Amino acid sequence: MGKRLWLWAPLALFAFFAGLAGYMLTQDKDEFVESEMIGQPLPDFALPAAFDGLPGASKADFAGSPKLLNIWASWCLPCIAEAPQLEALKAQGVEIIGIAIRDRPADVANFLGRYGNPYSRIGSDRISEVQLAIGSSGVPETFVIDAKGVIRYQHIGDIRESDVPKLLAELEKAQ
Amino acid sequence: MTAEIGLAALWLAAALAVLQMVSGAFALKAAPGEVNALAMHARPAAVVQAFLAVLAFAMLLYAFATTDLSLKLVASNSHSMKPLIYKLTGTWGNHEGSMLLWVGVLALSGGLLAGFEKRLPERTMGATLAVQGFVALGFYAFLLLASNPFERLPVPAPEGSGLNPLLQDIGLAIHPPTLYAGYVGLSVAFSLAMGALLTREVNPAFARVLRPWVLGAWVLLTLGITAGSYWAYYELGWGGWWFWDPVENASLMPWLAATALMHSVSVLAARDALRTWTIMLGVLAFSMSMLGTFLVRSGVLTSVHAFAVDPERGAFILGLLGLYIGGAFTIFALRAGAVAEGKRFAAVSREGALVFNNVMLSAILAIVLLGTLYPLLTEAFDVRVSVGPPYFNPASAIFAIPMLLVMAVGPLLRWRSDKPARLQFELALIAALVIGVIALVSFFGQFPLLPLLGLGLAAALAVAALLPLRGRSLKRVPVATWGMVIAHFGIAVALFGMACEGAFSKERLAAVVPGGTEQIGDFAVTLEGVTPVAGPNWTAIEARLAVRQNGGAPVILTPQARNFWSPPQSTSESALLTKWNGQLYAVIGQQAEDGRWQIRVWWKPFVTFIWYGGILVALGGLLSIAGRVSVDVRRRKATAQGDQRRADLDALGAAAPVPAE
Amino acid sequence: MIRLLLAVLLGVLALPTLAQDTMPPAPYAYNQLEDPRLEAEASALMHTLRCLKCQSQSIADSDAPMAGDMRHQVRSRILAGESPAEIRGWLIARYGDYVSYEPEVSKSTWPLFAVPVLVILVVAGVLLRRLGKRRNEGDGAGETA
């Protein structure tokens, strides 16, 4: 009998795999790598200005009230798509501090001229230093930072119109 | 018109697959020794089906060659400006085309089996053809219902959107077709195993029928993996030849199962042992091919080599996988208990060594399977993990090292039972080589453990592989034995290449001004200049690197950084300088703001041996097939002559004396 | 629909100039450390870190700009005296186990280590059953045969 049972083992293993694979096919493939820094304080950083129009950004700039930290770049196409949403958030009184990844001043100025400027400050991160330090894996990404400088929420990818209320609620929660 | 012919041929072939399946199944209804009248259609159905499926593939090939932009598949994967060779190879550089290739090879091998295999009992043959028809039917359904390669566009496209530049390489001409043919060859092994299981005809005669198919599939898989590894090595631009990527593992797993199957079939053929185990491996090997296809096509795992993925098609393949493999394992569980145990043997014997090798190969297979699928398992719980070389290398080495040691000794052992004392000299020689080489290499420097062990094992294995020839007249050694010797020697060669690459590679990354020189090992590499060049569908910058070994005459290498414009993508075309003892691998990168150019150069000693070894292994397999087939043909001729003589004697009348057999 | 069209149009217009950044790579993205011992440490570590923007490649095998920036982090941290284990820990604290190709025993990876042990046990069991017992029986059978 022991031998008979052994003969069913391949089928059992296969059934387990088929079930798992079938389940995974129904799931949306999650290409995002979430930051593990949620709930942690922002690391110390001080970035120079990304172009002449606005000051650079540092950790100290997040003190006072909850703010958005927007990781973006002038060479990134989805960043164009989210520009109107950032404008809308700014119109609601949200302060947005930008970090421009691997960017040149002229390109930053050009981008802001074409698609609007929702930022209060933009730091230039030429070697993705701060991006890596906060666990962001692409552009654009948007983080909610509370008044104590703690990372509270991460939004991966461009902000759609439907994402705006969620971000406002997270900012509210971070009060 | 061609597309419609192709589509019609596919539908007809599918209909014939139904006929083959039903007719083959009727063979099972026949009483032993008799032939069911309805069973006679299975063979012709398989043969005609092979012609139709190959015709369908030829039609698609033609459409790609002429860039028929009214076909959706051509428009979305080809481009009129592509060189002809890449137009042709582009036929299988996409999902639909590669599945049609798969089905074409499947039907072709089914046709060959039906047309030429006359040794099996009709009942077993019928069952085998029924299973083969059933498998083929599933894939026809998949092609016709979920991935029709002949779909027309309502309005022909003005221009095609091109082929992924990474695939625009001669590697695409070799790697997928060989690998697919190997995968599909295993489908015949699967059908034969199921046929034998259903009719309980698991015996040496069956094993002799199975063996050439397993060997053939295994040779093709070996070549396919070798070619794929070399292709990734020079195309991806960083000098890596194996990444333990899911898609690579998907091709390795059937190879591991087929290797085990091939050895276990030998035991069954020679000694009538390991019956259940052989059937089990026959099912497992094809399961791994289908699993590979599923992983590659469904995109459930992230891979650097995944070029055409689609979850819905993944679901279809998973359904087929469940049907065939789930069904096969169910029949296995129900029937295998009824297959009589084979002959017995001692632990120290050729069979014993082969069982050890089989179990170790299966364990390596289990590790690779686990490491490949584990990220999928954790993703079900929303946790993402990565499993890579630091896991696969040591975990598989745990089983590979004992396996390689036994592999050195196994061919020297006698069948059934042997005494270790008889092999004292050989055992001492092998041990001395392993220890001696490791000690010698460690004397010259600090090297990682696994490459070090690899060097010792490679040396011992290379010598041990030749030992079966000792004391024999080389002219009398059977061809199949030569095959084994060469294949085992090939493993040693490949292992040597891997170990050397792992232990002694040198890397130089630098920013160089034109005219500047970098030193790597014995080589001085001078950047003579960088010029723009243009190809049929790309532009590139090309570096002129003058390479001098120990101050000798310069050799010019011209690596390129290419920009393809349809689809827009850039690739690094590495330049290789091949010496007998290694390769210099050079890549040109970007230009820095100060005008210097990024160049990357590697010196990889004996890296080429990895692929030479693979080719030797495949050659060994080919010789083995040739040897077995020629013996079979001779035996069949002798039997035929005997029959003829007996018939003649019968005709002469009862007065003639009865010849002694 | 119009938004989609606009997005496509924007994409087409913007593609040539905006598809990729044109910044030069970070200093240590494509340059080795002077000290061969430190470079070997960095290189070994880089081969076991996953490029987050790529498909299943290590940062040592990728031309993606982010992989370059990660290489720069690794090399400059090694140069600053950090150990490879510290750097790996720093990255795992930011990206989770996903960033490391070298699974460590944790609550999400323990089966990767338990199963091979199980396989070893099964292998030993199978070999003992198939070969161990046969020896005794085989000897007996050998005499009668």
Q: Where are the regions that the model predicts?
A:
Chain A
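N-terminal targeting signals for export/organelle localization
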Residues: 1-48, 175
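Hydrophobic beta-strand anchors of alpha/beta hydrolase catalytic cores
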Residues: 68-69, 96
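Structural microenvironment flanking redox-active thiols in thiol-disulfide oxidoreductases
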Residues: 80-116, 126-132
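Short gly/ser/thr-rich secondary-structure transition/capping motifs
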Residues: 27-28, 48-55, 122-125
